[in-house]
Amino acid sequence: MSKRYLFTSESVTEGHPDKICDQISDTILDALLSQDDHSRVAAEVVVNTGLVLITGEITSKAQVHFVDLVRKKIAEIGYINADNGFSSNSCTVLVALDEQSPDISQGVTAAQENRELLSNDELDKIGAGDQGIVFGFACNETPEFMPLPISLAHRIARRLAAVRKTGELSYLRPDGKTQVSVIYEDGRPVGIDTILVSTQHDATIGDITDNDLVQQKIKSDLWEAVVQPVFSDLEIKPDANTRYLVNPTGKFVIGGPQGDAGLTGRKIIVDTYGGYSRHGGGAFSGKDPTKVDRSAAYACRYVAKNIVAAGLADKCEIQVGYAIGVARPVSLFVETFGTGKVADDVILDLINKYFELRPAGIIQTFNLRGLPSERGERFYQDVAAYGHFGRNDLDLPWEQTDKAAILKEALTSAVV
């Protein structure tokens, strides 16, 4: 008998309060690394009605006007009208930053760190910026090697923002959330059970003032302008049995920071795999690459994606453990959920042979310090909304599958 079940993942738009904070944190990171690529950054942001607070620890030679950066990013997201309860021009921006603790810095700093290319021995001398566990995951459910539920939730969220920004649905406001429940049979997606969209909107639409009629129009417009285009190129589509919910509370006029306070790092499941894979608990945004919460999670995704792309497994999850001030991981674990074409121990040996998981090595391999300046002072802020993984719209080093051929060849040689 086949096993049938549902799995649900959610996403949020760039105007969600927590995502505003993530994007501001990473905009600050981009600006600092663009001027000083060895900046140490742990930028935390809080937003509330009419207020932005920047706090955390930063050690950098860069000269950055934080208030201007914040206002520009808020305007880019779409909060330019005080009627939304939050505006780039009128919000108060407070800055309360400290320098990184020297007790932490001494564990991750080495004399060789400022060199562009480090030897193997030198990489061993630069430790992790903190203890922690990180996970990476990939599967072959989608072309981008991501689970289908989070892939669809992100697609809908991005499309929702796009039709707002282009003016196609000009009554939409920046805040929004999406959620998709996918039907699985024997571990493979076969259909769509539920699509949920909650979107902030104007109280009236043209001459329509009755809220029930407003909601009817929003629901109809979103189906035509958002949902149908998202599924147009996919084999799995909504059908007559799919539940389609829009603003199920009845309306969503008050939103953004006026509706809820936001905080950096509160959407870690949205940022990763939508709950389909485990999470080590550390957030990404606002952290420079010495923080393994971020850089090592990117590396683990790279490892898992190449393993699946090489055909060694249909699903692969990697866990790596780190100790502060220690370069080499204290643990490495592989799980293929019974889908591996070879034993997990064989895959583990291939990872140890072909992948770099020391923090300084990860930074060097992916050029994580240099990318912001190379890409016009914006790199990390572009992954701060709509997911850090599976982003075929961005050229991300950890999304490359350049090791897949090497893994295939190594495995073939070992078998022969």
Swiss-Prot record:
Function text: Catalyzes the formation of S-adenosylmethionine (AdoMet) from methionine and ATP. The overall synthetic reaction is composed of two sequential steps, AdoMet formation and the subsequent tripolyphosphate hydrolysis which occurs prior to release of AdoMet from the enzyme.
Organism of this sequence: Microcystis aeruginosa (strain NIES-843 / IAM M-2473)
One GO location term (cellular component): cytoplasm
Listed InterPro entries: ADOMET_SYNTHASE_CS, S-AdoMet_synt_C, S-AdoMet_synt_central, S-AdoMet_synt_N, S-AdoMet_synthetase, S-AdoMet_synthetase_sfam
Protein name per the record: S-adenosylmethionine synthase
Keyword S-adenosyl-L-methionine (UniProt): no
Annotated pathway: Amino-acid biosynthesis; S-adenosyl-L-methionine biosynthesis; S-adenosyl-L-methionine from L-methionine: step 1/1
Binding site for L-methionine: E57, Q100, D260, K291
Cellular compartment(s): Cytoplasm
PANTHER family attached to this UniProt entry: S-ADENOSYLMETHIONINE SYNTHETASE
Gene assigned in the entry: metK
Keywords: ATP-binding, Cytoplasm, Magnesium, Metal-binding, Nucleotide-binding, One-carbon metabolism, Potassium, Transferase
